[in-house]
Amino acid sequence: MEASQVEFEHPRKAFGWAARDSSGLLSPFNFSRRDIGEEDVALEVLYCGICHTDLHMAKNDFGNSIYPYVPGHEVIGIVAEVGSKVEKYKVGDKVGVGYFVESCRSCQNCIDNLENYCPKHILTQGDKHIDGTTTYGGYSDSMVVDEHFVTRIPEGLPLDGCGSSSLCWGYSHSPLKYYGLDKPGLHVGVVGLGGLGHMVAKFAKTHGLKITVISTSPPTKKEEAIKNLGADSFLVSRDPDQMEAPKETLDGIIDTVSADHSIVPLIGLLKSHGKLVLIGAIEKPLELPPFPLILGRKLVGGTLVGGLKETQEMIDFSPKHNVKPEIEVVPMDYVNIAMQRLAKADVKYRFVIDVANTLKPTS
């Protein structure tokens, strides 16, 4: 069920766009941010990527949205102020904020730099902070974040592209690394030709993998996938003949699709001992046939976003290997149209909001 809250007044005035109910429509929203603490950085938001999770949460597809809801967890900003005990950043630094802004810092996951799996992690948007107030995301002019949950953006990286990649870098690479699908010569399928999918394909090629893109997109997208992403082959998932021919040829599959779809045909593409890794947040329960898994010792697993250490490593890795997202930059007042287009997969490959230049305060 959806929930609404009475807005708590913090010291810092802020402005952004928010959904007020499960219609998912966003509109201008005046709110407030907490004051800067000793280990906090305050940042001016420059860019923010639009993720499919933003769309799901705006519409309460997961049943736990809190309104007003300010989306945005692919945030790029410039540090405007630092707390008295901040050590990693200074005013003027370019930084990123991803999917979460707090964790317990004492559980085994946190100790192992896997804060993303901490049972007490706090999401960047639509969650409850330690003080009980709602967290608001990056579709806004400013944020206040503990320095531990901020990543550094190296000089020379295009900041608009980083607005998508602050999440995608860790999210796209983590499943390849954790499931051992980053070894040269392996054949890996990538399901979905969207924001995450195209980055998975790009990272995979840096490891010397053979890549098959699997998509509902028409065959005309084949040349695009091969030319732009370096894919070795392309399958239209709605074509039974195409899905039948390469059965049991893939060492692994990374499924990035958030829309409801069957994974049964994907399991059939896996070799014995193959791994299907889900990173798209599908709303409905999956059909999971046991016999193909048992007889082929196949694995179905999943991953969340990368931890902070891994995400920073991938941010630093990307410019050295020319890995960068392909984006469409849009103004803030285009966000509802962008959401509609995203729902129809009508974007190549990720929307990024130019917050700094297009977010206009209301009186």
UniProtKB/Swiss-Prot annotation:
Protein name as it appears in the record: Probable mannitol dehydrogenase 3
Family: Belongs to the zinc-containing alcohol dehydrogenase family.
Function: Oxidizes mannitol to mannose. Provides the initial step by which translocated mannitol is committed to central metabolism and, by regulating mannitol pool size, is important in regulating salt tolerance at the cellular level.
Cofactor binding mode and count: Binds 2 Zn(2+) ions per subunit.
Top-level EC class: oxidoreductase
EC annotation from Swiss-Prot or TrEMBL: 1.1.1.255
Enzymatic reactions: D-mannitol + NAD(+) = D-mannose + NADH + H(+)
Keyword Metal-binding part of the UniProt annotation: yes
Keywords in alphabetical order: Metal-binding, NAD, Oxidoreductase, Zinc
SMART domains the UniProt entry points to: PKS_ER
A GO MF label: zinc ion binding
Cofactor(s) this protein requires: Zn(2+)
Binding-site list for Zn(2+) 1: 51, 73, 168
UniProt source species: Stylosanthes humilis (Townsville stylo)
Superkingdom as given in the UniProt entry: Eukaryota
Pfam families in UniProt: ADH_N, ADH_zinc_N
UniProt: Zn(2+) 2 binding residues: 104, 107, 110, 118
InterPro entries in the record: ADH-like_C, ADH-like_N, ADH_Zn_CS, CAD-like, GroES-like_sf, NAD(P)-bd_dom_sf, PKS_ER
GO biological process, alphabetically ordered: lignin biosynthetic process
